[in-house]
């Protein structure tokens, strides 16, 4: 059975275009994969703490030497990793904030990027250990940045996901959402065309 993991990373609890479009894409993928199981990870509702001394200490302390607090921190990270590893398809709702990703998504990435678990270093450099997944990134944007130096989100996500082994990544953009009603309508229509073709 196909498992679809949808990761919502907007700071908004309601009305986020990236989340709404990610929902539509997940529904489309369910139609294409009858019986698919959907798991939703909402990074707004289930907020993760930013990296600090305690979290780094938990990650870099050998399992048998961790305190109870460190074990709880590591267990949260490992549960997120297991959820990701179990997915066949990953849908990431990723609004463009200040030319990058949300802090919610960055913190999630910090919790799943674990040496020896999701990547490792070998004689030829790093090797991603999260393989065999199709990833869709749905990016909602107030302006138009794709293909310009203002879009640092796309190369960052491509690099990070590829570092973990996820190299089959497709981007769906809804750009110009804050550039007037006509531009917003055109942006959503274009995104929905891409979703229909996914």
UniProtKB/Swiss-Prot annotation:
Q: To which protein family does this belong?
A: Belongs to the azoreductase type 1 family.
Q: How does it assemble?
A: Homodimer.
Instruction: From the record, give the transmembrane residue ranges.
Output: none
| Alphabetized UniProt keyword annotations | Flavoprotein, FMN, NAD, Oxidoreductase
Cofactor binding mode and count = Binds 1 FMN per subunit.
Q: Which GO terms describe its molecular function?
A: electron transfer activity; FMN binding; oxidoreductase activity, acting on NAD(P)H as acceptor; oxidoreductase activity, acting on NAD(P)H, quinone or similar compound as acceptor
This chain is encoded by the gene named azoR
Q: EC?
A: 1.6.5.-, 1.7.1.17
Tell me the function of this protein: Quinone reductase that provides resistance to thiol-specific stress caused by electrophilic quinones.
Against Pfam families, the record matches this protein to: Flavodoxin_2 (PF02525)
Superkingdom to which the source organism belongs = Bacteria
Q: Which cofactor does this sequence's record say it needs?
A: FMN
Residues annotated to bind FMN: 10
Q: What is this protein called?
A: FMN-dependent NADH:quinone oxidoreductase
* Catalysed reactions listed for this entry: 2 a quinone + NADH + H(+) = 2 a 1,4-benzosemiquinone + NAD(+); N,N-dimethyl-1,4-phenylenediamine + anthranilate + 2 NAD(+) = 2-(4-dimethylaminophenyl)diazenylbenzoate + 2 NADH + 2 H(+)
